[in-house]
Amino acid sequence: MARVLPKKDVVIMGLGWTGSILGEQLTAAGLNVVALERGPWRDTATDFNIGYMQDELRYAIRKDLFLPPALEAMTMRNNLSQTALPMRDYGSFLPGHGVGGAGVHWNGHTWRFWESDFQIKTHLTQRYGAAKLKNLQLQDWGPSWAEIEPSFDKFEYLCGVSGKAGNLKGQVQPGGNPFESPRGREYPNPPMRMPYASTLFGEKMKELGFHPFPLPSSNMSRPYINPLGIRMGECSYCGFCERFACGNYSKASPQTTVVPVLVRRSNFELRTECEVLKVNLTPDGKMAKSVTYTDRNGAELEQPADLVILCGYGLMNVRMMLLSKIGPQYDPVSGKGTVGRNYCYQTSAGARLLFDDKHFNPFIGAGSLGMTIDDFNGDAFDHSSLDFVGGAGISCTVTNGRPISNRPTAPGTPRWGAKWKQATKEGYQNAMGFGSEGSSYPVRENYLDLDPTYKDRHGRPLLRITFDFPDNDVAMSHYISDQLEKMTKPFNAKYAAVGRLKKGWDSVPYQTTHNTGGAIMGLDPSTSALNKYLQSWDVPNVFVIGASAFAHNAGMNPTGTVGALAYWAAEAITAQYIKSPGALVRT
């Protein structure tokens, strides 16, 4: 029997980006908040010290900062006819672990989804007709651009994003992204200093008639003090961002933007190494009354609260809803139910170029450093004669020249021996690449549920992922690969190779940690688990914050939109819910 603890106003599951933002906003509003974090305490000064953080073997290869599958594994299959099997190691995606979550080891790409993304079904239907959407399960998200844009602004200024605005209050700006939706003000910091490869990419894209612009980056281009008064340092371009924490205080993370302020507030409590097992509902199932969790000693405890906020990694949010019976489970056969619906991923391709006479210095890198074009992203180009909708941003980034992972060689090079050594020597300074980050649109048969066979160490069913790349997304990716082929020509490289996506999602090789959907927001409780404020339709004192709320995934990294949704939900709670608890949207 779990020991019942004194009641709190709010209990938050997880202290990554969303949990720290919700914690800061709700404590500022005067609420007593406790956050339960499954992983350990992690702090920049003591855990990410610059003296040992740049350890490629420990962090990039052995995945020291990531969730151990022994704590939470998942099963996967490509379609309903297959039997799902456990992923014994995380490969395709890498969830975070501990305070800061995946916000510790990310690169820093900080995009805004476009206005058309939030009304995607309406937008595409009006432009192309309903038949164009084929078997896609697209739906509008709920908020208008005017409603959600200020929340993007808050997250960008929290993080100190380095970039160049492309659309200021409807006026296209030179040097920025002409395809972005209108923003209220410029980025807080100017763009990063561009390395040779990205500069060369930008020049060639201009020659082809495209619109290159600097990647919006949560790596600091200059010293910065954010609105909470937290000081950040200028990026040193060390090349240790993705899979690493930043010991230089130069990459935005919960630790460098929010947590130092939050943990000093008297109405906030953080309990680490505490794993939430279940959200407990009232007998009628209409309200949450508490969460049950285990602490670091294995003791089972119950934390009552007036408000329960799930802020885990998106996949974990969905699993917690399923385990707690918050909302009806989605059924891909009937199409009914909402929890588990519209699981999406990211659809990518890439080009690798090798030269004889370059000197790229790839070790001068940063997580979010490069030039991008959005000419083939979203609906920036006409799809009328194409057999798909959606698109991809195409970027040339220079993230690292680390010795274990960065060994570019020409096609046909032996995998070992003297010729391999010579090829790696020649390729290191002479290789560059650019890649696409494509949209992932929902279909009926891609979804999340609980596995009927495999359980975790607490006896709870594992999350089961049923996913394969939809025909629409494969067609889109092949079209983008065709564009990449054309883009390689002006470089006159000695070798140029372009990858092409194949059906059959494989969970082993790393692809991207951009898992979205499963607990999606929307306007209709029959097709969405959450309303437009990320509040459960079925249990109104539960809010679920994260990429799990995305009704689809766009052709860009999700973190900027995750941060915006966190601020959007926090404002709804503080301005509306705490004044009049209950459903914020009536049906």
Model-derived segments and spans:
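Conserved hydrophobic helix-helix packing surfaces used for dimerization/oligomerization
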Residues: 10-12, 33, 542
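A glycine-rich dinucleotide-binding beta-alpha-beta segment and adjacent secondary-structure elements
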Residues: 215-221, 237-238, 277-280, 429-440, ...
